[in-house]
Amino acid sequence: MPQKNSRKEYGADGYYHIYNRGVEKRTIFMDEMDYKTFIGYMKLYLSPPNMQGNKLKDPSGRTIPPSQSPNNYVDEIELIAYCLMPNHFHIFIRQISDRGMASFMQSLTQRYVMYFNKKYMRVGGLFQSRYKTVRVMDERQFTYITKYIHRNPLEILPKGPGPVGYFAISDLK
């Protein structure tokens, strides 16, 4: 019997709030480079192929050859907003094709886990479970989710200097 919520169906031209957190609520972004790497992978997956060039690098800084370049989802996913917190992330997207989100999220999270595990010399899963999604059905919900994603870091602002997370209305274009 399949796990609850293990089979997900998403429609084309739908808006979705996607989120996930670290297993045991662990930190999934340990330093600024981790945030930048996750954002870099999103940018690479969502940029037109002619803009990607040969920019993808592994954790040691070596360029990944074109034969190993990632899939591209620029015609399947439109990024609306995102927020990366120390132990979780939120991504708000418009899915253009029927299967874009599932492939995009699988590619993004697998590549980030590979980077993270190599960098921190660990093995195993990084995320608590498969990502969760909420379909945004109307303008009120759209506004609420956008505000929620951008206010999320304000809830845990530190008393001193230092990053609490990264968030933006799609600045990856």
Task: List the predicted regions and their residue ranges.
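Short catalytic/metal-binding and nucleic-acid-binding patches
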Residues: 1-172
